[in-house]
Amino acid sequence: FSACEVAWPSILAIVSLSVVGYCSLNQAASGSLGHAVVFQSAMAYIVAGSLNYYGVTEYIARWLLSRKALSGKPYLFVYIIYASMMLICIFTSSLAMIILYWAIFDGIYKVLDYDKKDKFVTSTIVGIALAFVVGGAIAPIRSWQLSLFNLYAEQVGEIGLGKFMGLTVPGALLSMGGYLLYQAKILKADFSRIATFDVTSLSNSDKMDSRQKKLLWTAVVVFFFVFLSALLPKSSALYPLIATKISAAGFFALGAAYVGLAATNGGKESLVSFSKVAGACIQWPVLLMIGSTMVVASALTNETTGIMAFISENLSGVFAGKGSWFVLIFTMVIVSILTNAASNIAIGTAMIPILAPFIASTGSNVPTIGIIVIWLVNMGLILPGASAPVGLIPGNEALTSKEAYKYSCIGMLIIFIVTIPLAIIGNLCL
């Protein structure tokens, strides 16, 4: 998973479970591609992907960045670039968002006569990619983050979306705030020209058309109920219907069905071209990775394989006599190192079943450990093989390899430092 495409290893992993005799191929296939998390992720790709495909996310991004209140406030303007990227990436994981924001920023620094090798330009280019990664870690409601969230719930214990975001939202805001502070005070990047930039020039010349408005409101309704299904207390009368019978997967599915069924342009055409959106926006390598993650993790923790017994026997000495604080610190350090040396998806999949028995035996804080693992495993920020977004950074022509790795490493260090007090608060309060 570290040095090659994730699709074929995922397929091979599913088939291998049958070859080694753990289960039949039918069971492996249904346990992977038939898993509810895969279905939910596919439907989320349709709903969120429609926003990208028909230009809604670009419209939102330009609207956020063209507010008059940002004029003459260079630090706030750059922070809003990061914050708006994080906000959008809660709902969509399309790498096109990095390319879109790079294109917008490219136009800004050229208008202001910045040299593309200027420290402000190069550090902000990396900062945009960091904001994409950090934003994707805020809420595990889609893609492989959702699979890790559910995997942790199955093997260790429930986290709760409210608790999760209670740590990750301030973590994200503080992380990008810390990176901006580094740019201004340590790197001493020149923000002065941004103060003269007319932010209203970024606004859209046209208003949203009827298709874009319908897609935006569909997404708003779908994501409202997705969050409601996760945050609704079990004592609520609506809980059985919203959280159990329909659930987040059902709301994404209803949204996907609606955009395919609804019409636009006076009923002359469908709201979306389902086949085009699916072809452009559904990431099959990620779906295969999610599916293989769920079924392989199940095999890892099954007593008949003996893998967990082997891990417990060999790592019991590390945790012997140690308390919950040791497990928390150990988890933070190991996950931060490994997720930057190999595929973050694979590391997350492996770490959860490995840590599961020791979380229970040491009386560790179940929600906090889960939040920290899923949050930090997202931060594959250094080596290109760690995550797909980071693979784009060295390819940006404005960056040298030294700059790409320098700013990525600094970004990771800032995120780790920010995570420390959040982990302490979580361990004491959750």
Residue ranges and their predicted role:
Residues S50-Y53, G72, L76, D115-V126, ...:
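Juxtamembrane and boundary regions of transmembrane helices in multi-pass small-molecule transporters
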Residues V38-M43, L76-M86, T124-L130, L287-T293, ...:
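Select transmembrane alpha-helical segments in multipass membrane proteins
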Residues Y59-G72, I311-K322:
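Membrane interface segments of multi-pass transport proteins and intramembrane proteases
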Residues S2-A7, A36-V37, A48-E58, I88-W102, ...:
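Short helix-coil transition sites and intra-membrane helix breaks within transmembrane domains
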